[in-house]
Amino acid sequence: MMKQRTIATPVKTVGIGLHSGRKVTISIKPAPVNSGVQFIRVDTPERSVVPATALAVCDTRLASVIQKDGVRVSTVEHLLSACAGLGLDNLLIELDGEEVPIMDGSAASFLFLIESAGIAEQEVPRQFVVIKKPVEVREGDKLARLEPFFGFKLDFTIDFKHPAVDKTGQRFVVDFSEHAYRSEIGRARTFGFAHEVEALREMGLARGGSLDNAIVLDEHRILNNEELRYEDEFVRHKILDAIGDLYLIGHPIVGAYVAEKSGHALNNALLRKLLEDPSSYEISTFAENKAPGAYSQESQPLFF
């Protein structure tokens, strides 16, 4: 039977919040079986616990933000994407501020941090959300869909009218029975446009944003001196975000995700619509030799 997993030993690091610009200490610790991923705001008097769930999402304008009883944790998607990529089910994540640090703008720092701590199997079967019928949400020309598929595959199309993005590719498909998260997705950085960054800073946001943690573009080109990590890094980062957003369902998904110009808001709307219809999914466990290829040792060696 495939088993639940947590981090083997506690690990800690310090980073900067993308929007607040404030230094944040983050500690990732083992958690009991069936507890899921829970954030703990150690800077609040009650050490408030905020579960990482789809129904806890309260804001999706610039990142995925979750809250409970008015206590917020923002920009959770990159860390949750790393948790999904490493096959982690149960974690306690302590923060001394509201925002998960941006690190280098990808999931790479979180992958390294968790791998350095090690991963421990727990003696309880791992649960999966198996998609039983298509579920789709649309907003204008944007869409996000989950459909039955015995594995985990993402097909994402972006549409940015910019020379640098046009040149690198607007669509990417990744099937995790054939590609590993760490090598194909985990290093893709967030990106933004210089004029948008200026506008955000005037609003008191993006104070921690820099060329060290984002790909920044002006009207014609990429401003970073560093080359792209993937030739189609922009769309791969959108997949990284989507994996983190989808992990708010609480379990790994067995199904296919298709998106056109989707973002945090539509991804969360998709999960909420899925949860509203119990006939659209089921919670299952798998014997190791019966598990989807996307979650097997051969295709995802980091899981083991």
Curated annotation (Swiss-Prot):
<dbReference type="Pfam" id="PF03331">
    <property type="entry name" value="LpxC"/>
</dbReference>
<dbReference type="GO" id="GO:0009245">
    <property type="term" value="P:lipid A biosynthetic process"/>
</dbReference>
<keyword id="KW-0444">Lipid biosynthesis</keyword>
<dbReference type="InterPro" id="IPR015870">
    <property type="entry name" value="UDP-acyl_N-AcGlcN_deAcase_N"/>
</dbReference>
<keyword id="KW-0441">Lipid A biosynthesis</keyword>
<keyword id="KW-0378">Hydrolase</keyword>
<comment type="pathway">
    <text>Glycolipid biosynthesis; lipid IV(A) biosynthesis; lipid IV(A) from (3R)-3-hydroxytetradecanoyl-[acyl-carrier-protein] and UDP-N-acetyl-alpha-D-glucosamine: step 2/6.</text>
</comment>
<dbReference type="GO" id="GO:0046872">
    <property type="term" value="F:metal ion binding"/>
</dbReference>
<comment type="function">
    <text>Catalyzes the hydrolysis of UDP-3-O-myristoyl-N-acetylglucosamine to form UDP-3-O-myristoylglucosamine and acetate, the committed step in lipid A biosynthesis.</text>
</comment>
<feature type="active site" description="Proton donor">
    <location>
        <position position="264"/>
    </location>
</feature>
<keyword id="KW-0479">Metal-binding</keyword>
<feature type="binding site">
    <location>
        <position position="237"/>
    </location>
    <ligand>
        <name>Zn(2+)</name>
    </ligand>
</feature>
<dbReference type="InterPro" id="IPR020568">
    <property type="entry name" value="Ribosomal_Su5_D2-typ_SF"/>
</dbReference>
<keyword id="KW-0443">Lipid metabolism</keyword>
<protein>
    <recommendedName>
        <fullName>UDP-3-O-acyl-N-acetylglucosamine deacetylase</fullName>
        <ecNumber>3.5.1.108</ecNumber>
    </recommendedName>
</protein>
<comment type="similarity">
    <text>Belongs to the LpxC family.</text>
</comment>
<dbReference type="GO" id="GO:0103117">
    <property type="term" value="F:UDP-3-O-acyl-N-acetylglucosamine deacetylase activity"/>
</dbReference>
<dbReference type="InterPro" id="IPR004463">
    <property type="entry name" value="UDP-acyl_GlcNac_deAcase"/>
</dbReference>
<dbReference type="GO" id="GO:0016020">
    <property type="term" value="C:membrane"/>
</dbReference>
<feature type="binding site">
    <location>
        <position position="241"/>
    </location>
    <ligand>
        <name>Zn(2+)</name>
    </ligand>
</feature>
<dbReference type="InterPro" id="IPR011334">
    <property type="entry name" value="UDP-acyl_GlcNac_deAcase_C"/>
</dbReference>
<keyword id="KW-0862">Zinc</keyword>
<feature type="binding site">
    <location>
        <position position="78"/>
    </location>
    <ligand>
        <name>Zn(2+)</name>
    </ligand>
</feature>
